[in-house]
């Protein structure tokens, strides 16, 4: 069984247990698993494909950027000032200016605005580009709370899943070369929580222990199933998004993104994070008791 096979491997072997990684492990020779030489062999094996991976990544990014260009071209005619404000927000002033433009056209061009928001959010998430936090806040300004929350969770889940697939396709050389030690440590945690992986992913999305971009690009390398990854992300981003969307209802009163988070909201997020991991803790204790 696959589970038994993973249990017999060293943490480093678990890191490389993708289909491509398994083929490479079988041809690695006499290096001892878990040794420094063993850790270095994989980057060497993947080095030849780094250039190909980069070309594929650039091609995919170019296609995605072209789609974003088409979405922008399909937008209603804008004034010169409005065109200047139609950009990915980098601070709260940008978010306010963009919100002002989108709210002006939202009622008349509802579908175009919704598609533009949806596509932009997924684009940022897919390529790990900063700015999605401001789009989360902006959703609370533009849409009713239930729709805004569903929209942000769906965009986050899809965007992170696209990033996952992109990493599976072309990102492994980067993980093997630059993130090996961190990925090995996380692979150990994943194996420890394998029976409750959805709860663990939810916990990680709520808490700031691991950056989202790191979770996205290393998950396919350490055998986190895509279905589990999507569900855990969709549910896990809901509590932080709740805070951001709620803040978006008072967008014009905010001056920085930090003002969207209060001590009460941090406390609530910590409680929800603990609740998400409790089933795994209780089941583990019951299992040990009956054994």
Curated annotation (Swiss-Prot):
Region (VTT domain): 140-251
The keyword Phosphoprotein is annotated on this UniProt entry: yes
Expression sites by tissue: Expressed in brain, spinal cord, kidney and first lumbar dorsal root ganglia during postnatal development. Expressed in motor neurons and proprioceptive neurons.
Region (Disordered): 1-43
Subcellular location: Endoplasmic reticulum membrane; Endomembrane system
Membrane topology listed for this record: Multi-pass membrane protein
Pfam family, one: VTT_dom
Catalytic activity field: a 1,2-diacyl-sn-glycero-3-phospho-L-serine(in) = a 1,2-diacyl-sn-glycero-3-phospho-L-serine(out); cholesterol(in) = cholesterol(out); a 1,2-diacyl-sn-glycero-3-phosphocholine(in) = a 1,2-diacyl-sn-glycero-3-phosphocholine(out); a 1,2-diacyl-sn-glycero-3-phosphoethanolamine(in) = a 1,2-diacyl-sn-glycero-3-phosphoethanolamine(out)
Transmembrane segments: 52-72, 109-129, 147-169, 197-217, 225-245, 262-282
GO biological process, one term: intracellular lipid transport
InterPro entries: TM41A/B, VTT_dom
Function, as annotated: Phospholipid scramblase involved in lipid homeostasis and membrane dynamics processes. Has phospholipid scramblase activity toward cholesterol and phosphatidylserine, as well as phosphatidylethanolamine and phosphatidylcholine. Required for autophagosome formation: participates in early stages of autophagosome biogenesis at the endoplasmic reticulum (ER) membrane by reequilibrating the leaflets of the ER as lipids are extracted by ATG2 (ATG2A or ATG2B) to mediate autophagosome assembly.
Domain characteristics, as noted in the entry: The VTT domain was previously called the SNARE-assoc domain. As there is no evidence that this domain associates with SNARE proteins, it was renamed as VMP1, TMEM41, and TVP38 (VTT) domain.
Subunit: Interacts with VMP1. Interacts with COPA, COPB1, VDAC1 and ERLIN2. Interacts with ATG2A. Interacts with SURF4.
Protein name as catalogued: Transmembrane protein 41B
Organism of origin: Mus musculus
